[in-house]
């Protein structure tokens, strides 16, 4: 059978360091407001697509988002776009967060966006981060990616921008 790596989230690490900083508190307050208004926390599915096995960034993002108050799901490693979309729908997530390091973003992310469009899924956003050359950003935005992050972005930026996009009146579609 096919190898399946298990991934888990270690929460509390990021929050214990930043819990008194205004940026951290601003985001956690926004998440609490979302919970009050929607009856549940914002939910993100963090994934790696294809054969990209560099999962450290995805683990860091997952742990930080949990500390911000998001419900966090982590997709198994080495998933195809259809498998990620299926899990995102089943888990009723608001955000699909794609971590990429191995240049699969040029084909795999547009394939994932096509799967979402084919299924008329318009109630979730897609964000991605990793080593994505600036020259590829327009292609990904055209495919429907809401935001793209790189090593220059802080985790606070990633959470804040992702939250802002998920609360826009029209997410995708």
Regions found by a protein language model. Give the residues of each.
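Conserved small/polar residues in nucleotide/adenosyl-binding loops
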Residues: 164-170
């Amino acid at each position: 059978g096919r190898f399946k790596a298990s991934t888990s989230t270690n929460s509390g690490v990021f929050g214990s360091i930043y819990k008194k900083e205004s940026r951290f508190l601003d985001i956690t307050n926004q998440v609490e407001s979302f919970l009050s208004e929607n009856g549940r926390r914002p939910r993100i599915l963090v994934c790696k697509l294809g054969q990209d096995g560099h999962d450290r960034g995805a683990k860091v993002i997952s742990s930080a988002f949990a500390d911000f108050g998001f419900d966090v799901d982590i997709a198994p490693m080495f998933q195809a776009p259809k498998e990620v979309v299926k899990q995102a729908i089943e888990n009723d997530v608001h955000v699909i967060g794609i971590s990429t390091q191995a240049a699969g973003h040029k084909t795999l992310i547009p394939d994932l966006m096509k799967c979402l469009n084919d299924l008329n899924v318009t109630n979730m956003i897609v964000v991605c981060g990793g080593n994505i050359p600036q020259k590829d950003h327009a292609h990904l935005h055209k495919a429907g990616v809401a935001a793209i992050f790189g090593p220059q972005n802080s985790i606070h930026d990633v959470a804040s921008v992702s939250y802002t996009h998920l609360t826009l009146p029209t997410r995708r579609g």
